Amino acid sequence: MTLSTNPRTKQIAASKGFDLGRNHGVLNSNVEYTRATKNPTSPYTSYSRTGLALNYQNTFAKVLRFNFGVTANIGGMNTEDDPDAQKGEWEKVRDNVLRANTSLKWLLNRSWITSLDFDASLNYTDNLARKRTYNLNSTSLPAVHAEQEGYYIAEMLPPVYYSTKYVDSKQLDYAANLKATWVRSWGDVHSNAKVGASWRANGNVGDGEYYVTPSLAPNGYRPRPYTDIPYMHNLAAYVEETLTVPLGSATLQLMAGLRAEKTFIKNTQYENTSSLSPRFNLKFRINDRLTVRGGWGITEKLPSFNVLYPLPEYRDTPVFATNYGSGQSAYVYHTQPYRILYNDNLKWQRNRNSEVGVDLRIGGTSISLVGYFNRTKYPYKLSAAFEPFSYNMMGVPSTLPDGTAYTMPANPAFRVDSQTGEIFVRDKDNPSAGWIAMQTTSTKRTFVKNTYQNNGSPVDRMGLEFVVEFPQINPIRTQLRLDGAYGYTKYVNEGEACYYPSTSTGGEFYPYVGVYLDNGGSSNVTYNGRKLHALDMNLTATTHVPSIRMIISLRLEATLVKRSQNLSEYRGREYAFNVDEDRNPTGGSIYDGDSYTAIWPVAYIDLDGNRHPFTDAEKNDPAFSSLLLRSGNAYSFNGDGYDPYFSANLSITKEIGDHVSVSFYANNFTNSRPFVASYATGVKAVFTPDFYYGLTVRLKF
C-alpha cells in the first residue's frame, strides 16, 4: 500500500499478487484513488480519479509466455461555485479510460528462428468537457456560423446570456506488433537478428465541440464532429542485426537496422506518405576500463495529421451593416471556407544524427563522454501565401428608383442571395411595399491569407554530454555523481515569408504584399536566424546510513551558460541594416547592437497576383514605404543571455521495520528563485522552479 501527499495531490494505492496455483499462472492487481486541487488556497476546482488494474501471466508447455492486462480509470474534474466567480458559471470534465493489452512469446528455439513475439493493445479515452459561461456585452453582437461559401445574414447574440459548451472526445486507438528473433553463434561470434512489423490506428469517435443552444454559439463557431475525421493508420516494418565479434581480449559489436513506415489516411492529397530510416551503431570494448562507441542514423518524419488531412477553416468578411428600430442591427457576411494548401514540392523532414562516445574507468571513477552532431534537413514550417480577393460592399440606398427618399423601416425583414450577395429589405409592417434592393457602395480589392506546409533551411545541433561517477567516500558512505550537457544550435532561414501591411489609403486596402527572407512573416522582426548555446550541470550526492536504514539524496542543478544571438544573413552578407527611429539608414554592422534595424522585401506581389523583383526604384517610391519593416526595439541583434542560476532538490527515504517506508522530497528546497537579467533587454526573469514538496508512505504486508 502506498500513501502519497503534497500540497495539491492526495493519493492512496494498494497492490496485491495472487498465485493461482500450479500451472494456473499469476494474477496481479492494483487499485488507486487520487484527488488533486488546482489551487490549495482556493479548492473550488478539483480532479479525482479511481483506477483499477489487473494483469494475468502464465507459461504454457514451457514455451508459450502469455500476458493479459486491463486498466480502467474513472475520474473527472469539477468546478464548484467559486464565490469570486460569476454566479452560475461552472466547469465539469468526465475523464474515463480503458486500456487492454496482451502479449505472447513463443520460444521456438529452432535452427531458423529462436522466438516469436506478438503484442496488441487497445486504448479508449472517454473525455467529456462541459463549461457554462456568463457572457456580457454592451450591445448585441453578430455571429456567423455558415459552412458553405456564399453570403449570409449573421445571427445576433443577446447582450447578456449564458452559454454551455460541450467538447466530446472519445479517442479510440489500436496497435499490434509482431517480431521474430533469430540468435546464432559461430564459436565466439554471436548474431542476434530481428525482423518485425507493427500496425497502429489512431482516431476519435466523439461528437467534438458543440453548444446546448446552437444559436448562442460564439461568432466563428462551426460544428466539427470528430467522427467526420478519418482514422490514421501506420504500418511499419523493420530489420535489425547485432553482431558481436571477439578481437583478442577486445570485443567489437556492430548493429545495423532499417525501418520503413507507411501512413494511410483516407482522402489525403499526399500519396507518398512513406519513410525510410537506416541506423548503424558500433561499440568497441577494448578492456574492462575502456569502451569506444559511435552511431549514425537518419530518421524521416512525416508532417502532422492536420497537414496530411487539413480541416476546414472559414473566412468571414463583413459586406453590409445597418441599424434600425431601437438600437437593433443587421449584418451580412461573405463566408469562404479554406484549408491548408497542398504543397506538391513538400519534402519529408529528415534528421541525420552522428555521435561518438567513450566510457572509461580510472581507479574507482567511471566517466562517460558523448559528442553528437545533428542536422535537420527540410524542417517543417507553416508559410503564408496571399492571393488577390475582391468583394462588393453594400449599403442602404438614399433614394428609391422613383427618386423618393428611402429610410430603413423600423421593423424590417432582410433577404440575401447567397450566390450574388444581393441584399433586399422589406417593411414587415407594410409588406405591400415589396422588397427594396440595397445598393453596391464600393468594390474592395485586397489579399486573403492562406497557409501551406513548407520546408525551412537546415538546423544544426551539436554538443557534448558527460557523466562522472566517483567512488564512494566510505567514512560517510556518500557517492557523488556529476553530469552535464553543452549544446549549440544554429539556423539561418533562407526561404521566403510574406507580409501584408494593414494600412489603407483613401478607404482602400494596401495594394502590395512584401516578400522577404524568412522572418516569420512578422511586421517587426528583422532577423532570419539564430544561434544558441547552453551549459547545464548537476551534482548529486547520495548517502546511505544503514544503521538507521535511511538514504539521503541531494541534487544541485545549475545552468552555467545560457546565450543566444539573432542573425540576419543572406548568401554570406548581412540582410538587415541599421536605421534610426524614423527609419533612416545609419550605417554600420547590425551586430554592433543598440540600434533599430530594418529590412526591405526581395520581391512584391500586386493586386493582379503578379510577382515583381523589389529594386532601388521601389525603395525610393513612397507608395512602397509601408513595405519597409523596422524592428520593434533597438536590441534585436544584441548578444543575449543570463547569469548562472541554481536550485537544489532533497530526497529522504527511511525504512521503519520490515513493512513501512517513508519518502520525503522537496524540490528547490532552499526556495532559490533569483531574478536574472537579460543581457540584451535588461528584463529580469525567474527560471528556477517553485518550491514544492511531498510525502509518500509505503506499507508492505
What do these predicted regions represent?
Residues 117-121, 131, 293, 325-448:
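Membrane-embedded beta-barrel scaffold of Gram-negative outer-membrane proteins
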Residues 2-4, 149-253, 500, 510-518, ...:
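Outer-membrane beta-barrel transmembrane domain signature of Gram-negative proteins
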Residues 22-28, 62-68, 109-116, 128, ...:
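Repeated loop/turn-to-beta-strand initiation elements of outer-membrane beta-barrel proteins
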Residues 228-366, 370-375:
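Structural signature of Gram-negative outer-membrane beta-barrels, strongest in the C-terminal barrel
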Residues 3-5, 20, 33-37, 72-76, ...:
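Transmembrane beta-strands of outer-membrane beta-barrel pores
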Residues 34-113, 123-146, 165-171, 691-693:
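Flexible loop and strand-edge segments within Gram-negative outer membrane beta-barrel domains
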Residues 247, 395-571:
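Gram-negative outer-membrane beta-barrel transporters
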Residues 376-378, 386, 559-634, 639-645, ...:
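C-terminal beta-signal and adjacent terminal beta-strands/loops
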